[in-house]
Amino acid sequence: MIKNLLLSGAILSAPALMVNAEPKVYTTDNLAQEIHVSLNGKYVAMGDYEQNLSYIWNIDNPETFQALPGESVAYEVANDGTVVGYIKQPGGVYRPCVLENGEWTLLPCHPAVANTAEANCITPDGKIIAGTQFINDPTSEIKGRYYPCIWKKNDDGRWTLTDYSYIKLPDHQGFLTKCLYVNGDDIIIGGRLYCGIGSEVPALIVNGELKFWNEISTYSEPLIWKGQYGAYDENGKQYFTDDPNDPNIFYYDYATVDGYRDGETGEYFAGEFSTVDAQGNFYGYRTRAFNVKEDGSGDLENGATIYNYGKDEWTDNTGFTNFAIGLGNADIVFANGGSMLVNGEKKKITEELGFTTDRIFTFVRSVSSDGKVLGINTAEIHEGTGEYQYFPAIVVLDEPLVAGIDNVIGADGVTIIVSEGRIDVAGAASVAVYDLNGRKVSSSATAHVASGVYVVKADDVVKKVLVK
């Protein structure tokens, strides 16, 4: 189903976004392109993949951007400060790693992994990591492909690898891991799938199985010029023939994506799921084809997109090139170009949230579950090269964007958010909410309840919560 408006959760009116005190903005002169805020807003991990340097920020010591050891790039951070990323080793080899107790630990890799493997995402509870490995494959044109993988933390603290190299991917570069969502027993990796001749589309890995929405077809055609078939003899010399059965005729491959001839006019599909929120909304961008004819011609339309995993629903918006992240329980979406959508209405982020940056504001990269802590990219132009350099900035608002959040509980991949008159549960396949008399009051992921004490059972997680 295609939708034009975002589904509303705990909807905020525009005045509710205006904070009472001046937001605090923390900056550094260290470069970083990767920025990730932990779900609880306590930590921010930052990585500079141009210099292989990383940093971590702690809300308890907000003026300090602490450097992480080694030539490393940090991608994400869990609620307890566990960081994942990669370490650069001698010879230009990149290996996935996890930072625990201030030290990097290398994660196990597939035995056929080539020079690149990364740990890209981690669950808020720090128990599951998702990543990417480039695995050698002589059948591939580029002699290998990027495959997704996960690592699970054992009771002894060690990490066990589950690689998905058995997944049949298009004969292209593979799948790049971008985000991770755990919903009960389901482990869902969001990312970018390379396909066709030169296209990229958003895709998921759901419990080790590839899921994407585009139809990819490949064909082979003979080379024809002026009514004759192009061919090559045993010495590699080209000639042309009228014989359609000549065994030396040269055939070239082409592909269609949703019926559109990929790259025929220099246009390709572009898309990925870049991030995901606690409600299972995957944010990113995608290309859609319209008016496709039998010859493969048609119209391509690019735009930002949101895919809700639980409802299997898309929200597309061609007014933006990309949706960076959002708060699905507050109908807030952060887009490219310093814009945000509040209940579907476009706003300028700095004006709506009441802060400024010394450098050029580019976009919000990550946000805490209550919207109080934002990790953003800022930029300035290098005087020597004329190119943009990207710097991190962390914005701490006086009040959370998600109205009335009183408590956030995380356990075993399940997140329970308690707010005034409301209980939201994310990451669980089954939910039941009981009052203290044992009466079930809700079995949905969002429960509107009166003030009081409730017992929330989400899969195997049982928590007692107070609703004001």
Model-derived segments and spans:
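Sec-dependent, cleavable N-terminal signal peptides
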Residues: 1-21
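Short, glycine-anchored, charge-dense loop/turn motifs used at functional sites
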Residues: 434-439, 454
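C-terminal tail/sorting-segment detector
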Residues: 453-468
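Residue-level detector of functionally pivotal "anchor" positions at catalytic/ligand-binding pockets or at interdomain
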Residues: 397-430
